[in-house]
């Protein structure tokens, strides 16, 4: 028996061919036909089984992919919702922080405005007080000058009328003048103490108002200190003017006293 190239030889196939050879050509053909039919049937069954297995694996793969896609979509939705919630939370925190910052800024501006208004009012009051004091001192000086002129005239008339009476009147006038001078000096010292106390209180209030400010208020502090320096300079100038006026008054009193003494000497002689 000959074997075709490319086919494997098996004892079963050899025994089958031996039986077919002994049975005759017709039986051989039938047997071969049956074997081919059986082989074809087996191939078809195997093909169907493979298709079913592949279909089952494909279905399982499709279901796994579908589950994975659904899980991925659910995870994406969950993360999107989480991101939205987180973004909403952060936006709310940012808004709250902005509102708190705005409220603190408004409160700071209001407190600063109140401090500035209070300082401005105090400065205006101090300027008004200085002006009133200057007017009062001018009136007092004019009144004192008028009184001195009247007293001088009275003394001159008294000298013309009667020598003894004039001496007595001059002594009384000198006594009154000394009392007036002491009174004026006491008033000047008292007013100086009051103004120094008010200036010290104003300086304390300014330092207290400017003590708790941040760096952004440094310019305002410097400006306020400059104004206070200018005010102190003005007060110092006013004090010097007042001292000069007091010196003029004292000089006038000394001149008047000297004139009275000279007049008394002339009368005595």
Swiss-Prot record:
It is found in: Cytoplasm, Cytoskeleton. InterPro entries: SF_assemblin/giardin_b (IPR008374). Residues 1-24 are annotated as: Nonhelical region. Residues 25-269 are annotated as: Rod. The keyword Coiled coil applies. Residues 98-144 form a coiled coil. GO terms for cellular component: cytoplasm; microtubule. GO terms for molecular function: structural constituent of cytoskeleton. Pfam families: SF-assemblin. Residues 1-23 are annotated as: Disordered. Keywords: Coiled coil, Cytoplasm, Cytoskeleton, Microtubule. The keyword Cytoplasm applies. Consists of a small non-helical N-terminal domain and a rod domain with a 29 residue repeat pattern based on four heptads followed by a skip residue. This alpha-helical protein is characterized by the ability to form a special segmented coiled coil and to assemble into striated fibers of 2 nm protofilaments. Belongs to the SF-assemblin family. PANTHER family: SF-ASSEMBLIN. Major component of the striated microtubule-associated fibers (SMAFs; system-I-fibers). This is SF-assemblin. It comes from Chlamydomonas moewusii. The lineage of its organism: Eukaryota, Viridiplantae, Chlorophyta, core chlorophytes, Chlorophyceae.
